[in-house]
């Protein structure tokens, strides 16, 4: 099963990949992950961006597949010559917008997934022999993350270094507040963020606040309200309604590493609150 990048936010990309890895278990296929040029968190070497953040899941690459001329491929828009294409009839046309259940019981030797898939959609199709059969979606996501998401050691070292310097020995609350382009997805985003602030207000006054936000405006609000209790990493943020992954930075891998650092630091904190409609918060909460 060739799992291509979905081409959206970092943890949206990871969530899609986890769903496809679950699909590979259901269909007994060998997963090959390739986050190509359409991945927003790619650098300029045109390789597999997944390996910039996590340990590789297979020694087989997309180029190895391209050299096997006896492959039969589903959907049939793909050939061994165009496996690296990133926008091949993705939204319209033959083989576009395929959901995970359409990959079940396919006879082809290679199946290619290039459109967003979700764990929830696949849960009813888990066979009784699967260890996650009958489990909640959150349990399945935890199972998949523990099995497949092994952060690179250099990223884990950065996490531990920051934690030891800024968070260790304190009662810590991780807070995720979205701004920028999220307001186009969530109409009442500001009121939801205000609910998060109300929750933080109710905590003990000595709690250190590890703030994850993509928006300078919300960072300023938290600093004005909570002062030195607010701890943040030095990462790219925006001061307008354009998401950081859409800024002309030139190196998407920097954003990806920053997202990894923030997320895994949040997992080290004693408690967490965030927006459940964000993939970042959903992954941390799971």
What are these model-derived regions, one by one?
Residues 205-209, 269-272:
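Short active-site oxyanion
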Residues 213-218:
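Short, polar loop motifs at secondary-structure junctions
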């Amino acid at each position: 099963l060739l799992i291509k990048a979905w081409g959206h936010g970092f943890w949206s990309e990871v969530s899609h990949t986890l769903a496809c890895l679950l699909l590979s278990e259901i269909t007994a296929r060998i997963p090959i992950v390739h986050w190509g040029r359409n991945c927003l968190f790619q650098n300029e070497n045109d390789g597999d961006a997944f390996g910039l953040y996590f340990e590789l899941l297979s020694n087989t690459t997309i180029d190895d597949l391209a050299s096997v001329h006896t492959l039969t491929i589903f959907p049939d828009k793909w050939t061994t010559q165009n496996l690296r294409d990133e926008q091949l009839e993705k939204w319209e046309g033959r083989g576009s917008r395929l959901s995970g259940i359409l990959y079940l019981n396919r006879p082809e030797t290679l199946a290619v997934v290039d459109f967003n898939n979700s764990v929830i959609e696949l849960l009813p199709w888990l066979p009784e022999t699967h260890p996650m059969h009958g489990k909640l979606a959150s349990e399945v996501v935890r199972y998949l993350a523990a099995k497949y998401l092994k952060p690179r050691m250099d990223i884990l070292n950065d996490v531990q270094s920051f934690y030891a310097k800024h968070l260790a020995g304190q009662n810590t609350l991780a807070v995720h507040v979205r701004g920028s382009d999220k307001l186009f997805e969530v109409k009442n985003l500001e009121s939801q963020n205000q609910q998060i602030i109300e929750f933080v207000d109710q905590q003990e006054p000595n709690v250190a606040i590890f703030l994850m936000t993509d928006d300078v405006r919300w960072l300023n609000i938290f600093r004005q309200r909570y002062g030195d209790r607010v701890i943040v990493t030095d990462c790219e943020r925006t001061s307008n309604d354009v998401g950081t992954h859409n800024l002309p930075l030139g190196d998407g891998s920097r954003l990806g590493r920053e997202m990894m650092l923030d997320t895994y630091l949040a997992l080290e904190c004693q408690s967490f609150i965030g927006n459940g409609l964000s993939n970042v918060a959903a992954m941390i909460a799971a």
